[in-house]
Amino acid sequence: MNNKPEATSEDRTFFGQPRGLSTLFFTEMWERFSYYGMRAILIYYMYYSVTKGGLGFDQGTAASVMSIYGSMVYLSSVLGGYLSDRVWGSRRTVFIGGVLIMFGHIALSVPAGKMALFVSILLIVLGTGLLKPNVSEMVGGLYNEGDTRRDSGFTIFVFGINVGSLVAPYLVGWLGLSYNFHLGFSLAAIGMFLGLVQYWIGGKKYLSKDSLYPTDPLEPGDMKKLVVRSTIGLVAFVLVLLLMALLGSLNLTNFV
């Protein structure tokens, strides 16, 4: 069953493109707003002294964390593609990713020190990996094969990315550096929340129902194996952290 919009005058309501493009345009615009807004002040938050509202890292450590953070964000897209194709479908995967990103920014908006920082990094890395590759894939899914609007549609979509990336550092940076870091992170969280709200509402109206389902779903037996292996991996990771804590070697310098 093909639920993609036809190229009729009814769907030419967003710069001559399928109406679903507006939903994805603003979803990715707000996601990039939240991400680049957060990044604009994160390194300052890490190396500013505690008396200035920061965490007191030395500048080299802060720069290393930022580099590792950026690398992990792009590596996590492999996981996002797999879960979309085999487990949740692209539409659900994007929404789950957005929720994780929002809670990642919320974690930073709370003055809870280094623990909140690393919880935030984990949530945003996972969330971005789920959202970013799949929202782009959904843009392509708006068009039937041979639809001449596809290229211009992607151009409009990328424009939304650029708008979010351009505006965020000024707004979040101004709020975070002029007033309070946690207020800046709160604005990033609000941006992702706005993206989720319009994605939820617009998705029901304008996005294909096919995107709710995985394109190559796991068989029941494979799903059970995936859950078991993921659980074993998570338990092993936690045990390693506990062992490092008992040995007194669980500190930032062992990771950057």
Where would I find each of the regions flagged by the language model?
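A gly/Pro-rich, aromatic-decorated transmembrane alpha-helix motif that marks the paired
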Residues: 39-40, 78-79, 162-178
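Hydrophobic core of transmembrane alpha-helices in multi-pass small-molecule transporters
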Residues: 29, 104, 115-131
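C-terminal ends and interior cores of transmembrane alpha-helices
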Residues: 96-117
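Central cavity-lining transmembrane alpha-helices of secondary-active solute carriers
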Residues: 63-84, 132, 166-168
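Short amphipathic helix-loop junctions that connect adjacent transmembrane helices
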Residues: 40-63, 248, 253-254
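Intracellular juxtamembrane helix-capping segments at the cytosolic ends
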Residues: 130-145
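Intracellular loop-helix junctions on the cytosolic face of multi-pass helical membrane proteins
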Residues: 1-17, 145, 173-256
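Cytoplasmic membrane-interface "Motif A"-like loop-to-helix N-cap segments
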Residues: 86-98, 146-147
